[in-house]
Amino acid sequence: MSTKEKLISHVMKEEPVGSRSKVTVVGVGMVGMASAISILLKDLCDELAMVDVMEDKLKGEVMDLQHGSLFLKTKIVGDKDYSVTANSKVVVVTAGARQQEGESRLNLVQRNVNIFKFIIPNIVKYSPNCILMVVSNPVDILTYVAWKLSGFPRHRVIGSGTNLDSARFRHLIGEKLHLHPSSCHAWIVGEHGDSSVPVWSGVNVAGVSLQGLNPQMGTEGDGENWKAIHKEVVDGAYEVIKLKGYTSWAIGMSVADLVESIIKNMHKVHPVSTLVQGMHGVKDEVFLSVPCVLGNSGLTDVIHMTLKAEEEKQVQKSAETLWGVQKELTL
């Protein structure tokens, strides 16, 4: 008899039980790993699968996490074969070429489209009912690409979008007002990145509109220069990349925030990238961030945001920029 047989007496043969809340992270780079650890520490799933083409790096990261299993309640698996991702509830795609210092997100695009042509069909093959969350940049275009390549309905393909931009915005407003970011309600919509749109008309604390107190807020004529906060949001990622080489922690926490709303069916409103054709005067088939309700089925509703004419014009300009790139893509 083996030690195990001496220790444990078997009562019944276990039926294989599928995971109830499996999450897959595709890509074990800095963003993938920050997303993975954020999901694990929030205890969001009973199984976390990780997949990447870089076999040694993947194996090392998975082992490193598995060595912490005692401190977690999640089974951790990893393989370069996509069968490891089978029956995932949410698949988070972080894989792709990394943005170089000074490189615009749009510049990355065709490099990443080619990577997606391999990734997306594999995800669909093993998790045909999953919710697909795209994080790789440029996120709005790649969410459109994932939607086209997957054949999924639009409510099951979501881009992480401006969830992080809005978090940065709220943090910086909080710093200026000496308040916690959760008490500063503020939204950034449109493109994740350089042409994002701050909705100054909606910024409020405890229901008090800040533009009501300072009608010049967010304009050139504002003596308090609130506009600089949006510039800091846009420049924030570039600044972090310049200082440490990449961004990871905040986007990882932002991803876990979105996964939580889906897995726990919270019906929370998040600014995420979705098909906005027909909204805010957008005519083309583009994905941009607007406030959306996330739950167990994916993106269930879109909030009709009241935008000022100038804000709406900026969203339309974003859409035109993205469509200009999208129509050149070879899918």
From Swiss-Prot:
Record has NAD as a keyword: yes
Source organism, top-level taxon: Eukaryota
Predominant location: cytoplasm
Subunit description: Homotetramer.
Binding site for substrate: R105, N137, R168, T247
EC class (word): oxidoreductase
Job of this protein: Interconverts simultaneously and stereospecifically pyruvate and lactate with concomitant interconversion of NADH and NAD(+).
Molecular functions per Gene Ontology: L-lactate dehydrogenase activity
Family designation: Belongs to the LDH/MDH superfamily. LDH family.
Name of this chain's protein: L-lactate dehydrogenase A chain
A GO biological process held by the record: lactate metabolic process
UniProt organism field: Patagonotothen tessellata
